[in-house]
């Protein structure tokens, strides 16, 4: 629910973004002028643009009229509508953040070029940062081989360090939020120092350490693994992003609409809930995906 509430709603179903690429800023610097000399042109810069077209996403269901009549405890039709609406909202939110997870050839797949998932987006838009847990353990222990830092503490420190270092490249707007699994949040909250004292007494202290506006847990993050172009497997740990930078576009008629019909041949009440929209991150380098390299562990296939 928070994802759909936080994204930017656009009244245009086709999302177009165009931005200047000035990463070669040194070549664009202003120059001092010496009397009598020729003034030189500064370097050129390129424009980054992409267009995202809409796709229809729907939930279709049916119920026998006999069941509607027999169930008297509650309004079963309204109850099923509530479930359909919840499923549609969850599917849209999952497609926006992670992708819908279906295989490319699946007939029901939400195309990743129609609703672009933040996690799987191009490196220009999403910074994919590795969390080096083994390296953090070595760094914390140092030359004191007798020191025994708890796994939770090492894990928490590795996540925080990777996130803060990656944030040096962050170009998003406002204060971002951190999305992760409930387990990762618990691991970081349970981190203890060598004396057994909790590092973070509550979520607010952890939120301050991560320098984010809110920590939002989502079970859908559990077990998500992607394969990179060089065939490495990366397990998603968390995602830092300000959903206001993501545009969800839909024109009049494309908003979430509910249709009902009664089939007299089969004596069934039928329901269709659908929307036609597009979605895309509109700011470059505005998302940070924290990942763990699981290439050699066999995770994810």
Regions found by a protein language model. Give the residues of each.
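Short, flexible coil/linker elements and helix-boundary hinge sites characteristic
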Residues: 32, 121-124, 130, 171, ...
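Assembly/oligomerization interface modules of large self-assembling protein complexes
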Residues: 1-60
